[in-house]
Amino acid sequence: MDRIIEKLESGWWIVSHEQKLWLPYGELPHGLAANFDLVGQRALRIGEWQGEPVWLVLQHRRHDMGSVRQVIDQEAGLFQLAGRGVQLAEFYRSHKFCGYCGHPMHPSKTEWAMLCSHCRERYYPQIAPCIIVAIRREDSILLAQHVRHRNGVHTVLAGFVEVGETLEQAVAREVMEESGIKVKNLRYVTSQPWPFPQSLMTAFMAEYDSGEIVIDPKELLEANWYRYDDLPLLPPPGTVARRLIEDTVAMCRAEYD
């Protein structure tokens, strides 16, 4: 699937190594390969954006390596492709040897996979399913500060799906574990690939059912109900958490304004 980059090759360039992204001048490289000293490198076409190819190059650059978070304010489709590139680069880096027999692996020519010629095992990129849920109680929404994000941002609850668990069960369990409340009338909203490191966020809205807030201090600094027109600092636009909060606010405005 990969190829040698030629002088006149053009497009968007995802140059990635160890979950980092090359961001000269703080932006994704876009244009001719020759302008970015990429001629002769191997590249894998991982998608298309606005009619131009998006290329993945597995390479470390001495300067300007940053996090894919730095391009979160790009259009959603381009951010998604950047995340795909970083995740694929890490997949290829971490699967050089077979986990069953220890022999060297090689990339598939037909799909995003690594193959073992010795035992014929096949590996695919790992994707971790997560749930994220906005919980509404009349004119208020449940928002929390997470232990791992000590930046004053308040957001909705989220967590990983466990083995043998449905998405609906994961929502009920995570909400109970983190906040001590029960929810009802769960409704699917959307999903978002989230490359931190390799999650698929599955977003829901729910209504408060019963219980008082009792936080899990290992997960949350605090949690509270916030009226829709008096909200604290929120996650940035482009995140599925912000989408859920804005959708909940819109529902409240329709009923209470």
Curated annotation (Swiss-Prot):
Homodimer. Pfam families: NUDIX, Zn_ribbon_NUD. This is NAD-capped RNA hydrolase NudC. Coiled coil: none annotated. Divalent metal cations. Mg(2+) or Mn(2+). Binds 1 zinc ion per subunit. A motif (Nudix box) lies at residues 159-180. A divalent metal cation 2 binds at residue 174. The keyword Flavoprotein does not apply. mRNA decapping enzyme that specifically removes the nicotinamide adenine dinucleotide (NAD) cap from a subset of mRNAs by hydrolyzing the diphosphate linkage to produce nicotinamide mononucleotide (NMN) and 5' monophosphate mRNA. The NAD-cap is present at the 5'-end of some mRNAs and stabilizes RNA against 5'-processing. Has preference for mRNAs with a 5'-end purine. Catalyzes the hydrolysis of a broad range of dinucleotide pyrophosphates. InterPro entries: NAD-cap_RNA_hydrolase_NudC, NudC-like_C, NUDIX_hydrolase-like_dom_sf, NUDIX_hydrolase_CS, NUDIX_hydrolase_dom, RNA_Hydrolase_NudC, Znr_NADH_PPase. The lineage of its organism: Bacteria, Pseudomonadati, Pseudomonadota, Gammaproteobacteria, Enterobacterales. Residues 125-248 form the Nudix hydrolase domain. Its cofactor is Mg(2+); Mn(2+); Zn(2+). A divalent metal cation 3 binds at residues 174, 178, 219. Zn(2+) binds at residues 98, 101, 116, 119. It catalyses: a 5'-end NAD(+)-phospho-ribonucleoside in mRNA + H2O = a 5'-end phospho-adenosine-phospho-ribonucleoside in mRNA + beta-nicotinamide D-ribonucleotide + 2 H(+); NAD(+) + H2O = beta-nicotinamide D-ribonucleotide + AMP + 2 H(+); NADH + H2O = reduced beta-nicotinamide D-ribonucleotide + AMP + 2 H(+). Keywords: Hydrolase, Magnesium, Manganese, Metal-binding, NAD, Zinc. The gene is nudC. The keyword Manganese applies. It comes from Salmonella typhimurium (strain LT2 / SGSC1412 / ATCC 700720).
